[in-house]
């Protein structure tokens, strides 16, 4: 059996990435304060359809995701279909794979095209850290269920008497891993210590990311892949990411205190991604349908892979596990790639993965390979800046990476690119795209 992955339909046609778009990414409680993930999702899909001049009725499937769930609209994909002029019979379902969510939605649509079930679909993801599902305590939740069944006033009063003041306080969403109780920041600290990653190196990577992102915006390269978002009640708008440090000064990074390990830590707010709001989406088609409709795809999916590792120690190593699998399925080695886009959740996590890419020992002990994945050429790596600068709306990052690497390859005359990310739960995702 061949290790090569056939990302084609029964006719041998490739899976085309026809277009991609995102909202600007905004820090929590700024430009998108009060705007839900659903509203941002509808916003970006509407604009994507308008820009591509694609009849919404031609969309056969929409797969969309979010990480911070909205109890009022748990199937965000279906609500986007109903709110964007698509046919009401359009297949729509929602997915979640933590920070790799829109990698998953893209693969799901691609696989629907590969099997011949559809020829045109949309994938993406959105998250709001400003519109959060605020919960109640377990004791209050239990009491509310009992109240619903209580018949007499006396029974209801007895239920209320079981509650203390602290039981009435709202409960914010958990930021820790359910199975371990560790936050992503604590995991990044683990990784910094495990792989001896210095504070100076973390700050330097963050500075590089912000500097490149600022230069990219100034060059106009992102104009066609980032929409202008008009925010309800439509008296203001946001046209670019607002987390990027313009004129980033490396010396200023050293002034911040550690955020997670106050005494001995090195992970700070400056070398971590902030909580972010935003949405992104891509249009996928069979190669033949794209050609018939007159589109010039921005890229094609060559291979993809998902992996999982233990969550107790250094769980944000997903790229180091998913990338070699995607490369193997594409029949490639790291040095064959033209560009590499790796999600920068934290500088420590990014540097740890880069270190393990170059480690023969890691490859032998963890991957069963007789050679390292390869040393990353920094002239190919996150050349437009990364998540440390742009921000990270969890479910939107995957399709942001895919669109960004495809469009940059197009500007450079084509080639192959890797988009890869770590994710909570010890998950990893990688996708290799080819651009003509």
Swiss-Prot record:
One of its GO terms (molecular function) is acetyl-CoA C-acyltransferase activity. CDD domains: thiolase. Pathway: Lipid metabolism; fatty acid beta-oxidation. Keywords: Acyltransferase, Cytoplasm, Fatty acid metabolism, Lipid degradation, Lipid metabolism, Transferase. It is an enzyme of class 2 (transferase). One of its GO terms (cellular component) is cytosol. It catalyses: an acyl-CoA + acetyl-CoA = a 3-oxoacyl-CoA + CoA. It is found in: Cytoplasm. Its EC number is 2.3.1.16. InterPro entries: Ac-CoA_C-AcTrfase_FadI (IPR012806), Thiolase (IPR002155), Thiolase-like (IPR016039), Thiolase_AS (IPR020610), Thiolase_C (IPR020617), Thiolase_CS (IPR020613), Thiolase_N (IPR020616). The active site is at residues 99, 392, 422. SUPFAM superfamilies: Thiolase-like (SSF53901). PANTHER family: ACETYL-COA ACETYLTRANSFERASE, CYTOSOLIC (PTHR18919:SF107), ACETYL-COA C-ACYLTRANSFERASE (PTHR18919). HAMAP family: FadI. Catalyzes the final step of fatty acid oxidation in which acetyl-CoA is released and the CoA ester of a fatty acid two carbons shorter is formed. Heterotetramer of two alpha chains (FadJ) and two beta chains (FadI). Belongs to the thiolase-like superfamily. Thiolase family. NCBIfam families: AcCoA-C-Actrans (TIGR01930), FadI (TIGR02446), PRK08963.1 (NF006516). This is 3-ketoacyl-CoA thiolase. The gene is fadI.
């Amino acid at each position: 059996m061949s290790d090569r992955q056939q990302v084609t339909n029964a006719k041998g046609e490739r899976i085309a990435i026809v277009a991609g778009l995102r909202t600007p990414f905004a820090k929590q409680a700024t430009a998108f304060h009060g705007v839900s993930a659903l509203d941002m999702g509808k916003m970006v899909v509407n604009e994507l359809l308008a820009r591509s001049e694609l009849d919404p009725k031609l969309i056969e499937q929409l797969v969309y995701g979010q990480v911070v769930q909205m109890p009022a609209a748990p199937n965000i994909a279906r609500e986007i279909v109903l709110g964007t002029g698509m046919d009401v019979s359009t297949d729509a379902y929602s997915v979640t794979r933590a920070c790799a969510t829109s990698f998953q939605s893209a693969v799901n649509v691609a696989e629907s095209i590969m099997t011949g079930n559809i020829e045109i679909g949309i994938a993406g993801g959105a998250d709001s850290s400003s519109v959060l599902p605020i919960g109640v305590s377990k004791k209050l939740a239990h009491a509310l269920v009992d109240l619903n069944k209580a018949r007499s006033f006396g029974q209801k009063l007895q239920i209320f008497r079981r509650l203390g003041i602290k039981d009435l306080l709202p409960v914010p969403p958990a930021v820790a891993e359910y199975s371990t109780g560790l936050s992503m920041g604590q995991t990044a600290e683990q990784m910094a210590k495990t792989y001896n990653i210095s504070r100076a190196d973390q700050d330097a990577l963050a500075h590089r990311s912000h500097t490149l992102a600022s230069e990219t915006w100034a060059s106009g390269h992102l104009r066609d892949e980032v929409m202008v978002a008009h925010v309800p009640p439509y008296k203001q708008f946001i046209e670019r990411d607002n987390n990027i440090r313009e004129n980033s000064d490396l010396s200023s990074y050293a002034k911040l205190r550690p955020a997670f390990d106050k005494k001995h830590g090195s992970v700070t707010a400056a070398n971590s991604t902030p909580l972010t709001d935003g949405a992104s989406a891509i249009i996928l088609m069979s190669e033949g349908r794209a050609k018939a409709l007159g589109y010039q795809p921005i890229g094609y999916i060559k291979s993809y892979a998902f992996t999982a590792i233990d969550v107790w120690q250094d769980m944000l190593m997903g790229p180091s596990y998913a990338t070699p699998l995607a490369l193997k399925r594409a029949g490639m080695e790291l040095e064959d790639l033209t560009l590499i886009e790796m999600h920068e959740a934290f500088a420590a996590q990014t540097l740890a993965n880069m270190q393990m890419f170059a480690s023969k020992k890691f490859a032998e002990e963890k991957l069963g390979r007789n050679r390292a994945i390869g040393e990353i050429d920094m002239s190919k790596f996150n050349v437009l800046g990364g998540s440390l600068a742009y921000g990270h709306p969890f479910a939107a990052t995957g399709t942001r990476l895919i669109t960004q690497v495809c469009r940059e390859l197009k500007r450079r005359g084509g080639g192959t690119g890797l988009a890869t990310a770590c994710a909570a739960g010890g998950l990893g995702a990688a996708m290799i795209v080819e651009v003509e």
